């Protein structure tokens, strides 16, 4: 599947609107920051379009903060290509690996990349490292980013670094790594805030959450996404 075919097939995803711009920008810059709200397709469509737009044969590593996310995103990308996970797209997390000699995109957790860098600071065979959900800061992610950036600056000036995160103020990050910023607008939905008539007891938060979900089911059709403390 070509870059153009990917964009056509998944054109409903907002990230498809910036796919060509992202590839064109990386043709002239070694680092790039991409901001996009949830649901834009940045974690699934953009890595595939980046792979199709690359002129070299090296791998893309994409870091996710959680193992479940790494597996699910790899499975989704493989499905988008009409393949099984472990072919063009695979993943590696603690105690589990689904990659093959054909794998060109590996979705990893930060700890896996850190161990790779300790074993081989050159990241031989890797052309691009993508830090997804960069706004979810942690000690592991900061260490992995620092080591990758050091490799890019001191050893591999051909290594490309892409940061993807939710739409927040990225000016400081952009200045620190001297990277341009591309924004995907995403889909905008109306938001209505409703407050409970009674303040729940802080020691019975589980009951309060259950009550809110039951109320939502009664008042609305469709699915529910609950953010839990």
Regions flagged by a language model, labelled:
Residues 1-229:
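P-loop NTPase motor module signature
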């Amino acid at each position: 599947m070509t870059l153009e075919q990917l964009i056509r097939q998944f054109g409903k995803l907002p990230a498809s609107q910036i796919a060509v711009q992202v590839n064109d920008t990386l043709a002239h810059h070694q680092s790039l920051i991409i901001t996009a709200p949830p649901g834009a397709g940045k974690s699934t469509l953009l890595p595939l379009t980046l792979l199709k737009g690359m002129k070299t044969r090296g791998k893309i590593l994409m870091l996710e903060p959680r193992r479940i996310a790494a597996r699910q995103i790899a499975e989704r990308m493989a499905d988008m290509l009409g393949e099984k996970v472990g072919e063009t797209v695979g993943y590696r997390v603690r105690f589990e690996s689904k990659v093959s000699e054909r794998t060109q995109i590996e979705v990893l957790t930060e700890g896996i990349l850190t161990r790779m860098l300790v074993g081989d600071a050159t990241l031989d065979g890797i052309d691009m490292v993508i830090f997804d959900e960069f706004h979810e800061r942690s000690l592991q992610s900061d260490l992995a980013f620092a080591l990758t950036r050091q490799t890019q600056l001191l050893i591999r000036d051909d290594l490309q670094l892409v940061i993807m995160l939710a739409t927040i103020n990225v000016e400081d990050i952009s200045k620190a790594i001297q990277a341009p910023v591309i924004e995907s607008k995403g889909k905008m939905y109306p938001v209505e805030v409703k407050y409970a008539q009674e303040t729940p007891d802080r020691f019975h938060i589980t009951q309060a959450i259950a009550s809110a979900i039951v109320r939502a089911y009664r008042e609305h059709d469709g699915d529910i996404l609950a953010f839990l403390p």
